[in-house]
Amino acid sequence: MARKFELKDYRNIGIMAHIDAGKTTTTERILFHTGKIHKIGETHDGVSQMDWMEQEKERGITITSAATTAFWKGKRINIIDTPGHVDFTVEVERSLRVLDGAVAVLDAQSGVEPQTETVWRQATNYSVPRIVYVNKMDKAGANFEASIESVRTKLNGNAVAIQLNIGAEADFSGLIDLVEMKAYNYDGQKEEIEYEIPIPEDLFEKASQMRLALAEAVADYDEEIFNNLLEEKEILPEQLKAAIRAATITGNFFPVVCGSSFKNKGVKKMIDAVIDYLPSPVDVPPIKAFRDEEEITIEASDDQEFSALAFKIMNDPFVGSLTFFRVYSGVLKKGTYIINSTKGKKERVGRILAMHANSREEIDEVRTGDIGAFVGLKDTTTGDSLISEKAKTFVLERMNFPEPVISQSLEPFSKAEIEKLATALQKLANEDPTFKTWTDIETGQTIIAGMGELHLDIIVDRLKREFNVQARVGKPQVSYRETITKSAEVEGKYIKQSGGRGQYGHVWIKFEPNPEEGFDFIDKIVGGKIPKEYIKSIQKGLEEKMQAGILAGYPLINLRATLFDGSFHEVDSSEMAFKIAASKALSRARDAVGTVLLEPIMDVSVFAPSEYAGDVMGDLSRRRGLVREQETRSDGANVIRGHVPLAEMFGYSTQLRSMTSGRGTYQMQFNHYEIVPKNISDVIVKQRAIKEDD
């Protein structure tokens, strides 16, 4: 089957922002104006097309990334609407990994907010070109220029307006396109009709100056415009458009547009900007892949062998497991086999679906640039590479996900539900790489861990709604970590040689802090002192002990272990003996390597009237917090930002409401790990102390 759209006419984009900036409403308006839906839904009414989970409709927030496709002026736009709440940052992360461009939505009153900074940083990590859409221009306190300035100062982004608003707040009526130098107003029952008007006289000079500033901003990336400016020649809209596009795609420039999605103003022009300035799959650098540890690139072309990345797993009540994927090369027809090159497993593609939020359309094939879903893959999880059977094996660049920072115990109401609970939790863990579940060895309790209290609330809610499992939930607990601060060489022995076949494992390992994140295992055994077949077991013994912890039962992170000496016995040595010997070495190293406890430090932003600012800052300090910044917004609210240990933030919402007479709100997200102060660490370690292995 031939292509309906050339690859250059694809736009794979994400809508990203801070919570309540209007992402989902913006996506709804795009679908309405492109003819994908015929009735506009509102998130506050609980009838939004893109928010399809029950919890999303009730809470008016986006939890999972819904995918859909729209068509505009001969272009195919694949859209992923991502969550703005910090607890669901993994959804943003995995969406950005498979997108070619993004629309960053700002609230015109607030400008850049804390979660804007997070998603912007994620987009920068994946080199995703962006346009900025300043939404809610009709809101009290809306300020287009201040919003642009906040992108420059807080995000260090070269943001330049390509539009000028006509009026603001209640007087926001339209906009001026600075590229074309045309003005537009809006009419109709929902103001969905856009029509051209003369540029208002009182704004003509300002618009001309802003167009010149725009040309000067892109002149650094376009020689023709640079020369035209020098020679004071006219710069045509086509020239300016081409220069903006080139600068945006390289990530050097962020065009800024404005509007009010709720009022339908500026949405069509924003869709035009997506088409004009964001890249197609052929405009971005080829995707990186690895073949036998050698880096290669994959060309975006139907003529190449099929390759795709699984970026999301979802359990659907009607069809079962859905694997969302992005095709990077080649063509795949349903009914064929593919290889999961990450796991070395063969999978059969029975059905392929094109998705629209939670509705679906069955299709026969997918091609380069497509985003779709496979039904019923058995072994594939988020981040896995999928390639054709014929392809010489390679793995696409993987996604990295943060570890959970908060945990709770779960206890089913009846013993009959224990197995049901375990099955349900495993399905949810397969969907979400930042959600972990395990059984506490000491207490036998089921533990769930995630990115925040809301994250775990949603998990418990889904257990009840989707799997009909009810459970008692324990108090939230901080997910501490352990690490080492010094180097030491330690011996580990496991020798039992009395009667029958014995056990013999003997290692010398140097432990040191790993300057990079993660675990590095280095084998420096020479002369056959330990046979090669036991080396993997030694590494596994260390990894298992790291997971169990050596100080207070929390996972040990950022460790480098160099195996440099040891001995073996011809008869009594075994993989198990060396695994235990390695585990004992790490246990024995606990004091010598200066093991310490780490705690998650949160980025906290508190919004409160200025008269409460002193009380708020004092309270944060009492919680071991470090206040980093204070600013007054255009609506008079004070924003106080700081770093506070998660352990001190439980119950904070109740305290804040009491302190501010119900007028304060806050948001927080994980920032980094820090060493726990000794007086607090000593108490935690005493409660959970691990005995050193004999």
UniProtKB/Swiss-Prot annotation:
Q: Where is the tr-type G domain?
A: 8-282
Single GO MF annotation: translation elongation factor activity
Its function? Catalyzes the GTP-dependent ribosomal translocation step during translation elongation. During this step, the ribosome changes from the pre-translocational (PRE) to the post-translocational (POST) state as the newly formed A-site-bound peptidyl-tRNA and P-site-bound deacylated tRNA move to the P and E sites, respectively. Catalyzes the coordinated movement of the two tRNA molecules, the mRNA and conformational changes in the ribosome.
Quick one: which residues bind GTP? 17-24, 81-85, 135-138
One GO biological process term: ribosome disassembly
Organism from which the protein derives: Mesomycoplasma hyopneumoniae (strain 7448)
Keywords, in A-Z order: Cytoplasm, Elongation factor, GTP-binding, Nucleotide-binding, Protein biosynthesis
Any Gene Ontology CC annotation:
cytoplasm
- This protein is called what? Elongation factor G
As for family, the record states:
Belongs to the TRAFAC class translation factor GTPase superfamily. Classic translation factor GTPase family. EF-G/EF-2 subfamily.
Q: Which gene encodes it?
A: fusA
Subcellular localization, as worded in the UniProt entry? Cytoplasm
Please name the SMART domains in this protein's record.
EFG_C, EFG_IV
Keyword rRNA-binding applies: no
Pfam families tied to this protein: EFG_C (PF00679), EFG_III (PF14492), EFG_IV (PF03764), GTP_EFTU (PF00009), GTP_EFTU_D2 (PF03144)
Q: Which Gene3D superfamilies would you find in this protein's record?
A: 3.30.230.10, 3.30.70.240, Elongation Factor G (Translational Gtpase), domain 3, P-loop containing nucleotide triphosphate hydrolases, Translation factors
Answer whether the UniProt record assigns the keyword Amino-acid biosynthesis to this protein.
no
Q: What InterPro entries does the database record attribute to this sequence?
A: EFG_II (IPR041095), EFG_III (IPR009022), EFG_III/V (IPR035647), EFG_IV (IPR047872), EFG_V (IPR035649), EFG_V-like (IPR000640), EFTu-like_2 (IPR004161), G_TR_CS (IPR031157)
